[in-house]
């Protein structure tokens, strides 16, 4: 990135951050935290950033500032959000955890907890309705009483490109949702969903294969053609 396009701000530069619509709070022991912001970024809802740790980086790219709250609770966490459209998020990023959101269509309401040494990745063209929750761990430990050892462990969550997540969906650790798939309202995702499938239920199960979606309703032919091309389904 060129210097005139990206601006690096210390988390202590409160007046400059406020010019971008960012309110930042550093808790005791927080230092060397950096926020990167694109010049010309528009703020519609305002963003609260909370640091509790050191050497964290939040990189905000694109035309629109995400709204909501980012809480980085530990050292060496990283957040990269690149969006030209609405993103409203409440994310908790722990020690050496990573949050990556790349050019979504829109995220109207995401609550996420990204545990130490795990990642949450959301690909381009994704559409999230309100009330979506994503966890990369169970938060507490389950112990096998025969061995005295923990049997549940954290795991990454990956949402590939052009995925539609309906309202009030919960996505749990070690889950991957493949390109172009759809997850129905109030579903609970506990593993891998292949590309171009419709899943719903608690736990989520496949309702239909070889499907995808477009944002228009009724569906516009140009959007169908664009979607099919993106999924490499058009014949030459």
Residue map of PLM features:
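Terminal amphipathic alpha-helical/low-complexity segments used for targeting or macromolecular assembly
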Residues: 1-66, 125, 131, 139-142, ...
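A short, terminal or domain-edge coil/loop segment
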Residues: 146-148, 163, 168, 190, ...
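C-terminal/domain-terminus segments
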Residues: 176-200
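Flexible, glycine/small-residue-enriched loop-and-beta-strand segment within the central core
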Residues: 47-50, 54-176, 203, 210-211
